[in-house]
Regions:
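Conserved beta-strand/loop scaffold segments within soluble protein domains that form the structured core
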Residues: 1-247, 261, 265, 269-292
Length: 292
């Protein structure tokens, strides 16, 4: 995705953020023309103690391709709250690469939500350069029909006292396929690292497929690291309970799916509520390409 974006993006949006005053920014990009290409490249530099809340909304339809590359450097004590809401309609495709470097005491919070693309691939790449930084990654992807949703994340700790919280959720239905690979690297220099990684998945169709691989590589000997993965269907006892209260089967299933998704979407910035992400992800609101 990176080389492709660099070869096609004629422009780059560069932002330098300084000062302790929080800044909020929303960027909306739409690719709708048949066989169109939308290359997006964004460069962020957050100086010491700077704070930015960035929401990116990506809309795609027709046989379009959206290519996103974001590169960010967080100075000491800087904070970046970053959301990517990707709403597509097949056969549109999305390729996204998010590369973030963190200095000590910085905080990076990434929340991603995607559905509807024929192919959606997101690649968060996080490097904690000097330790004592915090990273929080929350992802939600939905794949149905013949759609493929892929997330490959990579986090590396270069110094001591770093921390990571990662939760990735996926729903696969129809003949959709969801792929998650989360790599965490803890070299010897990264003592006292505290990292947790969890992949939770719902498989709603016999023809759907889920591949999940949380991955820890630990060399340091003084760490607290854990990972796990679950793949399940909707729980029959929960469905039975709702139906016993007079709720029909379809509505009961939708309620359980809403609850599954809501946990991940709670991490989105407050401004994201204008896009009604839960309703759009579950196709219960306005058309995906319609602006709020």
């Amino acid at each position: 995705p990176v080389q492709f974006n660099h070869a096609t993006a004629g422009r780059c949006l560069a932002l330098r953020v300084s000062g302790p005053e929080p800044i909020s920014l929303e960027l909306v990009s739409a690719a709708s023309q048949p066989e169109s290409l939308l290359p997006l490249r964004l460069l962020l530099l957050l100086e010491e103690q700077a704070e930015l809340e960035l929401s990116q909304v990506l809309l795609g339809s027709g046989s379009s391709l959206t290519s996103l590359v974001l590169e960010a450097h967080l100075g000491r004590g800087a904070r970046l709250r970053h959301a990517v809401i990707a709403l597509g309609e097949a056969p549109a495709c999305l390729l996204g690469h998010l590369a973030v470097e963190q200095e000590s005491e910085s905080r990076y919070q990434l929340s991603t939500a995607s559905r509807g693309w024929a192919l959606a691939r997101l690649e968060p790449r996080i490097s904690q350069l000097s330790g004592a930084a915090h990273t929080q990654l929350t992802g939600l992807q939905l794949a149905e029909e013949r759609q493929v949703a892929v997330t490959h994340s990579w986090v590396r700790f270069e110094g001591p006292d770093g921390s990571l919280e990662q939760l990735h959720k996926a729903i696969a239905d129809g003949q959709g396929r969801s792929v998650f690979n989360g790599a965490v690297r803890v070299p010897r220099a990264a003592q006292r690292t505290n990292a947790s990684q969890l992949s939770r998945n719902l498989l709603l169709s016999p023809q759907a497929r889920i591949d999940t691989k949380p991955e820890l590589e630990i060399v340091a000997d003084d760490v607290r690291c854990a990972h796990g993965a679950t793949v399940s269907r909707l729980q029959l006892d929960q469905l039975f309970y709702l139906q016993s209260r007079g709720i029909d089967a379809e509505l009961a299933a939708n309620l359980l799916k809403r609850g599954f998704c809501a946990e991940a979407l709670q991490q989105l910035p407050a401004a994201a509520a204008n896009w009604r992400p839960l309703e759009r992800l579950l196709r219960q609101g306005s058309p995906l390409g319609e602006l709020p």
